[in-house]
Amino acid sequence: MNPSADAPGAEDPAPTGAGEVIPGSFIVVFKPDAADPPGLADQLVREHGGRVDFAYSSALKGFAGELPEAAVEALKHNPNVAYVEPDMTVQLFGGGTQPAPPAPWGLDRVDQRTLPLSASYTWGASGAGVSVYIIDTGIRNTHVDFGGRAVWDFNAVKGNDPDTDCHGHGTHVAGTVGGTTYGVAKGVSLHAVKVLDCTGRGRWSWLIAGIDWVTAHAAKPAVANMSLGGEYNQAGNDAVAGSVASGITYSIAAGNSSTDACTFSPASTPDALTVGATTKVDAQASYSNFGPCVDLYAPGTFILSAFNRSDTDAVYLSGTSMATPHVAGAAALYLETHPAASPTEVGAAIFGAATQNVLTGVPAGSPNLLLFVGDSATVPSAPPAVCEPSKPWSKNCK
């Protein structure tokens, strides 16, 4: 596999999470006790006008579609409706093919406590029997690094967007989760859930449709990876929370804006593992978001993985998008040996096993924790070194 080296300069991941409102498009979230969400959505549109694009029943209850302003105002006062939000754009949190040293240093780093790197990656578990859902641009399932373990599941992108990864980001992320060469968990089953188009952009309504599909159809034990996001969005956060409540562990990118991750979604979801990015010298990456909504860090700069241009393609990318699948892979390793573990228990194991206080440039209020998979098969006997009360596994803090 020949990694590409034809790209922008170092630490130049894709755009920040600033979102744009989609004119006339809205997300309507029902109250938890609402019955028959698809039927209710159709009824409300018949009464008030508009069009239903997606009906949500599993991660949350509600629908997304085009609505006239009068309908929006009426729905805000409907007793079945919790809230209405404008649909907005979202995007991936990594990109740009980049030159880098010829080694998958991210894998090398997460199996040892300290530098220097050992030029090897040692693993015990492989994630066999665990399903990882890549909620992204899709996956090039035929890539040799997946060894037939990648399948296509769902496409939420509206229009004529094909059931393929026409961007490359999702294939790269999947490779870091579970590629034979580039992956943390080399035996997982990889599932493509497409919510971003060929440009790497999408809408919250598409993301929620993907989350809703995973919640309804996941083969457990299951992990979901979301190397994407946008400005704070309550419906997006609620969808992730509902999916986690169903038993699926979520690994989510903190974002690439060098600011507080709590202002982004779904990074600000308390129920998920939110991941910041580091460099090869154990520094917080200059682009990485930070703050109390970040749970831990993982390698994210100059990460080599599979790409979509051929079945043997590989490139280097940077971003919190690249850090996040390291954690998703670690979750899969844990679930192989603890298949009945809840997302809270998976989070506690990863959080507690992380290497403490080796990172530089981590702002106050952010956890100085680096992913470590050497203890991935063992529930940590000690409580986490950093306790964040908003996180569900904070009960492990003493």
Protein language model regions, located:
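N-terminal domain-start motif of subtilase-like serine proteases
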Residues: 8-20, 66-73, 96-134, 154-166, ...
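C-terminal subdomain of the subtilisin-like protease fold in secreted/lumenal serine endopeptidases
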Residues: 12-17, 53-54, 188-192, 206, ...
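Autoinhibitory propeptides
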Residues: 12-16, 42-106
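Subtilisin-like serine protease catalytic core
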Residues: 102-103, 120-152, 160-206, 218-223, ...
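Short, surface-exposed ligand-recognition loops at beta-strand->loop->(often short) alpha-helix junctions
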Residues: 29-37
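Structural recognition of the beta-strand scaffold that forms the well-ordered cores
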Residues: 26-29, 64, 83-85, 131-135, ...
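Ser/Thr-rich, Pro/Gly/Ala-heavy low-complexity intrinsically disordered linkers and tails
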Residues: 2-8
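The feature captures the short pre-catalytic strand/loop hairpin that immediately precedes
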Residues: 279, 300-326, 357
